[in-house]
Amino acid sequence: MAGKIGFVSLGCPKALVDSELILTQLSAEGYKTAKDYSGADLVVVNTCGFIDSAVEESLSAIGEALAENGKVIVTGCLGARKNADGSDLIHSIHPKVLAVTGPHATDEVMQVIHLHLPKPHDLYTDLVPSARVRLTPKHYAYLKISEGCNHRCTFCIIPNLRGDLVSRPIGDVLLEVKRLFESGVKELLVVSQDTSAYGVDIQYRTGFWDGKPVKTKMFDLVNTLNQIAREHQAWVRLHYVYPYPHVDDILPLMAEFAEHGYGVLPYLDIPLQHAHPDVLKKMKRPASGEKNLERILAWREACPDLVIRSTFIAGFPGETEGEFEYLLNFLDEAQIDRAGCFAYSPVDGATANELANPVPDQIREDRRARLMAKAEEISVGRLAKKIGKRLQVIIDRVDDHGGIGRTIGDAPEIDGLVRVLPANKPSKRYRAGEIIRVTVISSQGHDLIAET
């Protein structure tokens, strides 16, 4: 009889892909997924360990799984965290867990599952190649192209948790892309810790795809993704793109999107974090504020439809009021379409904790609120310019009031939405995953209202 596994997935899209890989292997080996703890033979919790709130959420989820089930395997970023004395953090708080692994550890997790719940042997499922299990809606999927990061930003401990950059072979990546599109995916979201650095660790080694040589390099990857996506009338969205000079090369591909309607979207998720040169230096970020602004303005010139999303940290240690005002001015000049902001929070093990002149909590929160107000002001202004225009929208879900979708400028869960009013013809109903053209009739905050 097949064993049943309960599964909890926490954290970022990269962790979500790790969860999907584990679930795919479980499915291939004949295990079933339980809907609740009581129906599971054991539970796997994929954790996040980046910021304090994520650590608390992960520890709480582990505790709940132990209380409800008793047999728990922990994996993910929090599994790599240690106490000051070098002991395992999770075992010190939850000593009854069966095992703890770090991130991207499918093989290790499966070994522990086999130990406590031997896999059902099936002559056929043991031989059939697995199809990837996904936790997202059927019409979009995350594509992880690399693991780890070579940067040593002072506020971040991800390299300690996930290691240095390891790029996936480009042939493997493109094969996964083809299979995802053939399974019905209409939007592919490329994720990593540093998408722009793809291939650096292996000196841009030449791989093969469709019988042709292709370099393990950002431009070559994006160019090929663009071609495959057009063939399948689908979208590709790029996340975690650092503003290196070679990113300039992909802007012409994005500028072509308006002509084709499919391919690589004119959308860049860029983790800028700040704009003032002195703050960026303390953060040990790989680019300067002046160059970032210059590059963004050049990108907008090359691709007028470009949408830029970014995240920022307010109240970093030593940040002055003048430096924060500089950041607000940067948002205005760069016209960042979508922005998120975190008030700086000390992360255990981050070297930024040792910096002088920490900013008081209240000032940190005040600056975060001010930045978000500025971001909303910019976003609302840019969305207002879309009223009356025809736009493409991908439908995420359908209800009695029409459809809920997203434009090319909206990534799932983190950006805005489009409420598409019911079609004029009663017989016409939208379908999840359908890409349609709409006319924008109004805006509400970060969202749009449209009709077909």
Curated annotation (Swiss-Prot):
Q: Which reaction does it catalyse?
A: L-aspartate(89)-[ribosomal protein uS12]-hydrogen + (sulfur carrier)-SH + AH2 + 2 S-adenosyl-L-methionine = 3-methylsulfanyl-L-aspartate(89)-[ribosomal protein uS12]-hydrogen + (sulfur carrier)-H + 5'-deoxyadenosine + L-methionine + A + S-adenosyl-L-homocysteine + 2 H(+)
Q: Which UniProt keywords apply?
A: 4Fe-4S, Cytoplasm, Iron, Iron-sulfur, Metal-binding, S-adenosyl-L-methionine, Transferase
Gene Ontology BP term (one): tRNA modification
Residue limits of the Radical SAM core domain? 135-382
Indicate the segments forming the MTTase N-terminal domain, all copies. 3-118
Give the enzyme's EC designation.
2.8.4.4
Compartments reported by the entry: Cytoplasm
One Pfam family this chain carries?
A: TRAM_2
Cofactor binding remark: Binds 2 [4Fe-4S] clusters. One cluster is coordinated with 3 cysteines and an exchangeable S-adenosyl-L-methionine.
Q: Name the enzyme's class.
A: transferase
**Domain annotation TRAM: ranges:** 384-452
Q: Which family does it belong to?
A: Belongs to the methylthiotransferase family. RimO subfamily.
Query: Could you tell me which NCBIfam families the record lists for this protein?
Result: 30S ribosomal protein S12 methylthiotransferase RimO, MiaB/RimO family radical SAM methylthiotransferase
Q: Which PANTHER family match?
A: RIBOSOMAL PROTEIN S12 METHYLTHIOTRANSFERASE RIMO, RIBOSOMAL PROTEIN US12 METHYLTHIOTRANSFERASE RIMO
Q: What is this protein called?
A: Ribosomal protein uS12 methylthiotransferase RimO
Please give the organism.
Answer: Polynucleobacter necessarius subsp. necessarius (strain STIR1)
